[in-house]
Amino acid sequence: MSATNARTTPLRRLATAAVAVLAALGMAACSGGAGSSSSSGAQVGDRSPEQIKEAGEIVIGIFSDKAPFGYIDADGKPAGYDVVYGDRIAADLGVTAKYVPVDAAARTEVLASNKVDITLANFTVTPERAEKVDFANPYFKVSLGVVSPTSAEITDVSQLAGKTLIVTKGTTAEAYFEANHPEVKLQKYDQYSDAYQALEDGRGDAFSTDNTEVIAWAIQHPGFSVGIKSLGETSYIAAAVKKGNTALLDWLNNELVELGKENFFHKDYEQTLAPVYGDAATPDDLVVEGGVDTTSTN
């Protein structure tokens, strides 16, 4: 199915803005190089909260093309649900936030190579990832969803047999379908923006990623529907730090407890996600306060 060229949506405009500033953000990400040191003498990634305070800046990895969670807004500034959280982390440390764009597949690497202190790029906790990074307690929960053209809507995984499913590299969707549905042909992209464009251009039959994302995208793209709204088990989104940085990990977990007392993530949802989802979702379905999912039956 071909995209309608004349269609311009808020997410499309944001994607255009992201392209315009991505190079500048990338330069900022690389300016220090791997293992860069702060004014405190400690390497980014290895720093404790006190060393971050001394440096006056915390470096946070985010998505630049994944609205409404992490993206570049029309003014060329980082925005979204994860960015509001990142801004609060920086404020409570008494420092400024420096945001670095990351691809989904590079979220662990930027921590291991000392490019960021924290990854806040809508990072789903998995056992495999937990071997490479240390996850804080969760602040969001998701499952997988599948979006497809309404004219050829995919409503059950069985319909994907022999068809082409678009996924983004390094995501839980890629891992899930590789492990559970080898009958589905996967077409992989590095960037979310490229994956969505491939769907619009008709290069694949459907696209799968977190249900929160495909629901938001479909709302703003007439002609596409989320026929599968929940696939696989409930997964959790959390901040991640370099493996072994227990000082920063403990600070983040304590911060989550304090933020939970004020329902911070409900407020973040109302600011960044509610305008997109409307009645399609509620904060109680998605947010996790205090680092503990009180609705879980597991």
PLM ranges: what are they?
Residues 38-122:
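Extracytoplasmic small-molecule ligand-binding "clamshell" domains
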Residues 87, 96-159:
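Acidic, polar ligand-binding/catalytic clefts
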Residues 109, 123-131, 200, 204-234:
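A ligand-binding cleft/hinge motif common to bilobed small-molecule-binding domains
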